[in-house]
């Protein structure tokens, strides 16, 4: 039996909590890699899940939720771009999936990735339907979670090095 994935939790300078988890690719990702990342000649070795704690429940009215989701997406895009280019610099294929559209940022993809489905498949978190959307249910944060996904061909050692370097440069503090 495989051990559960290790989740590292960080606190940003503004006090936001972020969880980062490195997991093997799901069956869906493995089966659809060519559609998700058509320009890759190597296999995905790991998915990097980035879960951000939202300041509001994503079950709130859309007028409260949309500005929060935009802010969380922007934070992920900044972090994710820095991480994928650091991994690229060390020779690994890497791409992130835009949480809003589900499409890979760098690939000319015709397949979307559902972040909630990836988290459900890898971490076992529940997903519920709510007003034509699917919401992830975090075991502690409940509906206050914004998931995002990065794919890479890098080794675990290289991923850990890049994440440690990037989180340190951002002054994100690991929570014990």
Q: Where do the protein language model's features map onto the residues?
A:
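Auxiliary alpha/beta "docking" domains used to position bulky ligands
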Residues: 1-175
């Amino acid at each position: 039996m495989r051990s559960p994935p290790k989740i590292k939790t960080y606190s940003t300078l503004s006090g936001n909590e972020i969880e980062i988890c490195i997991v093997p690719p799901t069956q869906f990702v493995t089966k659809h890699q060519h559609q998700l990342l058509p320009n890759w000649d190597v296999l995905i070795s790991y998915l990097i899940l980035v879960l951000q704690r939202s300041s509001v429940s994503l079950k709130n009215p859309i007028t409260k939720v949309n500005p929060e989701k935009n802010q969380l997406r922007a934070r992920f895009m900044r972090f994710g771009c820095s991480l994928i280019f650091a991994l690229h610099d060390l020779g690994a294929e890497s791409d992130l999936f835009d949480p809003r559209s589900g499409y890979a940022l760098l690939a000319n993809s015709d397949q979307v990735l559902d972040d909630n489905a990836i988290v459900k498949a890898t971490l076992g978190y529940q997903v519920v339907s709510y007003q034509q959307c699917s919401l992830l249910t975090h075991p502690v944060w409940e509906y206050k979670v914004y998931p995002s996904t990065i794919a890479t061909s890098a080794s675990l050692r290289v991923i850990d090095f890049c994440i440690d370097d990037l989180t340190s440069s951002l002054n994100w503090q690991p929570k014990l």
